[in-house]
Amino acid sequence: EMKDQEKTENMEEPRIDKTIYTGRPENMEGRLEKEIAVYDFLDSLGIEYKRVDHEALMTMEACEEVDHLLEAKICKNLFLCNRQKTDFYLLLMPGEKPFKTKFLSKQIGTARLSFADGEQMEEYLNITPGSLSLMGLIFDKEKKVHLVIDKEVLDEEYFGCHPCINTSTLLMKTSDVKEKILPALGHEYQVVELPTE
């Protein structure tokens, strides 16, 4: 009986603190260095953001509850590479859009795109799978990762992402991303239009 109970408990949705906080956590205890680096980066740019804390979110479905709480859609982040594993791409796209390689390959001029592995994600972005975020680019000092953004993400009023760890989600104005964050990161980026079907 206990085993069955454990099973159902493990199947439960991640616990989400329903409080919407403003800015960085007051208490940094237990927060990772890379997460704190994200708050420092945002604060240095004078960016206002909302924050929700939660257990690790591993699926887009789990993210939906956070989206609902923040009243915004958090985009899907994909870490891709070419076949030779010499070019790496961080793609930000709407969560509900299906990812179809051929449309992206055509627009960015790279054939045979595939998902890069977790080791490379850690090496270049200091992030482990499940926590992928635009904010990882603060660790890509050598600008090895190409940033690719679906136009729809930039057209949204708000932009949501993890602070390099999937136990918090941040929400900020997309205009701040375009006018302050992207210039501060210094990564050139390409805007693409991916099909909804």
Task: List PLM regions with ranges.
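Extended, low-hydrophobicity, polar/charged segments
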Residues: 3-197
